[in-house]
Amino acid sequence: MADENETVVSAPVSTAAWIYVFPKDKELLDVLSVLSLMERNSPIVISPLLMNLTVENDFSTTVKTPITNFGGTILTKITSFMPVCFFFHGTEQLVGMAEDHGDLIRLCEQTRQKFHLQSFEVPTARKVIDIKALCSAVGKDADSVICHVACGNGFKELLFAGLLIPCVEEQIQVQVGEYSCVKIPLYSATLFETEETISLSSCTEFIQERGFFLPALSETLFYYVFTSWGTTLRFSNTKELIDAGLKQFTQDGEQTVKLAPHKTYLGISGQKISAVEKDFLMLVDSVVTELSFSHVAEYLDSVYDPSQIMNFNDWPIIRNSETHAERMAQLTNLKLHLSSHLAVLIFAPNSILYCSKLAFIPNVKQAFNSVMTQELLLRSLSFCNALSSLSDDVYNDNRKIIKCDSTSGKDDKFSANHLAYACATSPQLLSFVVWNLNRMSVYNAGNAHTEIYNHLVNCSANLCEFCDGKCCQSCIGTAMVRVGTRLPAIPKNVKKEPLVMSMFSRYYAEVDILGSFGRKPVSELKEIGKDQQNTLSLDRGKFVSQIFDYCKKNSLIDPVTGEDTFNVRSKKDFVSIIHGLTQCIEECVSRCIVEMRRTQTPREQIENCLQSFNVDTTPYATAFSPFLTFSYYKVILTVLQNLALIVASGHVVDRPCTGNSISKWLVQQYQSLYGTFHSSYLKKGFLNTRTVKVASNVDMEQILDCDLYKSGKYVKTTIQAKLCRLSMQCLRDFRIKNRPFNKSSKTAHNNPYFKKNVKHKKNPLSGCISFLLFKYHDKLFPNVKISCLELWQRFLLNNVPKTLDIGNPEEVKTFIKFAFSITNTYDEIDIIDIQPECLSTFIDCYFHNKFLSALGFHDYLTSLHGLTSKLVTQNPVLFPVVLDKQPKFSSIQEYLVYVKKLVLDGVPNPVIASLSKEPNFGTIFTSRSLVTFGLTLEKFVSLANREYFQFGQLGWIGGSGVDRNLNPTSSALQDFRFMRQKTIIATKFSEVIVKKVRREAIMFDTEVVKGKVLSIVENLTNDIDPELLIIAEVMRDREDKPTMDDMLFFVDGREALAASIMLKLNHLVDMNVKDFSITNLQSVFETVSSNDAPVYDFSEILAEEDDQGNGVLKCDETETETDEPMTKKNRL
């Protein structure tokens, strides 16, 4: 049965690998030097795949690539290109721009030996491609060009093994940005040779002579891609991993066991668990590794459109830069912003870079010798930090332990080897990380930076183990000393922790205080017109929107950006504005509760509400950064393994292995496992995919005649191209959720983390309006020369001298009384525990605090917080990278003097990224941000059908060195706020690399006028004709008379009222009146104030109306109101 959400797509028949030949241009090299991964001693540069930078504007990211030749038919497979490309020729000048970080290649080799990872070995029998001859064949001088290769995910193993054949006869001239380039197709060797002859270890004479093989390129792929995948999958035999991937793509081996016979089991010997538990753990490990490896290939070899950020010329920072210098400055700033996220991934012990170990953590409540069930096993399995197990003994496929020769022993402290391991021992990745570490803040641990100073003085001895005293100002040794206090600890015990990852956010998010509660479903909106008798659900957003509409009408908030725009002129003005706003909020709360009753919305819906946001899982979401692409692959592999735990645990419990060989057992079970897993996790609450169907599976194409080309003749022939698979799943996004209400146990109300204590009278400067008091201090007290903080402290101490001109004392008393009143009123009902930093947050918090307290909620909620990156300047003495040469100082004083001299000579202060609190959390997602967060993937069984569902729970970011904003203030204060707060680290990319989409509700001029007109209609005016007020408002900024249609819009369709107003307006136009001020209009119509005139007494009637709602607009909403207290009235 076809998927109802299936999308029909098309893709061109084309090869999935291209060589690009660029002219060697200084400006291009400058840009690439900032965006790429490179190391001074490696000729290969890893760059992002961006249109108009590395590929042409109409580049096809997904293709049907010819893979097998059956005489009269070519079989094609769908694959998408990797988000990176590899510059392999002409890079001497480019890598020369890289900062020198010491001998990173040697460090990576030492790391592989220490942690038992495979090293790349150059095949001695393979012939290296002649790049000069290739350039000459397309009419280019090899010395004046720079070349890169872009390849599809399915072709990466072929590229590594030199099994791609360049066809210079099919060269194409393309325009890439400002440069005229040549691109050369690379065809799979499987088109020219039989499957039996295609392997990593041997090749035919044709492949030997014509194959595109570069040892340096293969080595880069070996570490950047394959070693990284291997460490994530706990599979140390990288060569077998590559061979398995090659066979999987060329021979459709997804449903066969490929890795298990060569797999070893790391991290099990060090766990204190029983023999039975070890068996379970090894079996589950083999299953999740195999399933994840098979399925990640299916997802990556699928259909993906280019993301919005892939067009380099459309980046706002590029489009708005007038000179090359401006462009480079903006790109460098972008790179610095990314260092905020890299810092989290490096310094958090629960980072995705470290958490590859599958551990068995027995349940404390589990009875001894109890029968193992799927639920018990699943609850005991977790991915955790692997750094403490890298040198452990391993088990082989026959469950025999293999002793590892490790002379160094276990490490107790994080070292440069661990950093290289986290970078998959790729020198280019490690160089990028060190560049960022050299530009991160130093966290002092009580030694007043003397450790850094002493290190720099000791550098003069040229004894550095990494650079031999050649570049200590920028080498990895100095970087490790600088951030030594921030590096993660090596865990001694296994524990369950969230996985910290960096992903690109999607626009839509339900992240306000109550998240999904009171959200009107789209399906219901469609049904409203069909059946008005249906019981409708509560629309909470409608009431919050009414408050924001009030703010927009009164010019308190910018209707587009949401920023504060109101202007305070005096204390009385301040009190009037805030009092009016709080009154509006309380009225909306009352209406919301009445609506809650009317729609019969139970209180339990509030307790069960969820906050959620989505992160993009398409391969091109983070294509602007090769480091994030490296991290992306780890995230997808880890998540697939986590999802596979459900199937694996059930299968292992039901069908245990009775023999010695794990791989033999897995071969017997794999067909069943693969079929079960293939659909077990889709539409289960976490991973969202898109089903696509390719429009045509058979094409008649002009394709290279492979048999003739092999014999030396180039001929294109019309041949049938048939697609292997029509329908497939594409990754779309993860849904991350948070429960605002603590429901972890029955005794949750006794949990000190969520229990609200009795508070005393609060200082307004630490309350809900503190941001306003600071912001408008100069306008509230224009003649006071002391700071806001000092003035309010004097108010609290009753110590304000009369020499301070604070204004009218009675007015000040009223103002102070109001500030204390609103602060303490808010504090009494505050269970969100967020101090507002802008008006929109104040509205959100005040509304929901009032709403929840009225419904009887008293304990604190879990709240979401954002830290956004910003750039700040720093003291250069802590950044040796500013030095222009190797440090040669005999004392600390000499170093400090030298740095001061550099500053005097004009060397700018170093700029680094820092994190600051985001006042409006929701803007993180509307501003299209890169987000770093913790994720716990919970699994639970549905009571309805006993199927397992997933819940992507937002978790914490571990470690004390990630950022100072994440650390608790002091344990002595008994402030458990940090336990209730979950933080996301973000960099907003709207108007940086993403064009801003105006999706916000924009208030047009006519809407603003309409709002003010309706306000006049609905409010009482004692002495002025409301119709004259409407005319004055409508004509304020107009030169021409509005039409009847305009007036009907302004008065919301009240035809009689519009006709009456137009009658007056026409009379004014006939009299040629130009001044439409209210004073002039009154004089024209000779209106007389009735304030002093006798009046009729309707007090008895009005008193009844006042009891019901204080105005005609509230009558229908307050028909069930009584004299009961508000809390009791609104109890459900």
From Swiss-Prot:
Gene3D superfamilies (alphabetical): Viral ssDNA binding protein, head domain (1.20.190.40)
What domain of life does the UniProt record list for this protein's source?
Viruses
Note down the stretches annotated as region Required for nuclear localization. Answer: 1112-1132
Biological process per Gene Ontology, one example term: DNA replication
Q: What are the record keywords, sorted?
A: DNA replication, DNA-binding, Host nucleus
Q: Which GO terms describe its molecular function?
A: single-stranded DNA binding
Keyword Transferase in record: no
User: Would you name any one GO CC term?
Assistant: host cell nucleus
Q: Where in the cell is it found?
A: Host nucleus
Pfam families (alphabetical): Viral_DNA_bp (PF00747)
Function field: Single-stranded DNA-binding protein required for DNA replication.
Q: How does it assemble?
A: Homooligomers. Forms double-helical filaments necessary for the formation of replication compartments within the host nucleus. Interacts with the origin-binding protein. Interacts with the helicase primase complex; this interaction stimulates primer synthesis activity of the helicase-primase complex. Interacts with the DNA polymerase. Interacts with the alkaline exonuclease; this interaction increases its nuclease processivity.
Q: Which family does it belong to?
A: Belongs to the herpesviridae major DNA-binding protein family.
Q: What is this protein's record name?
A: Major DNA-binding protein
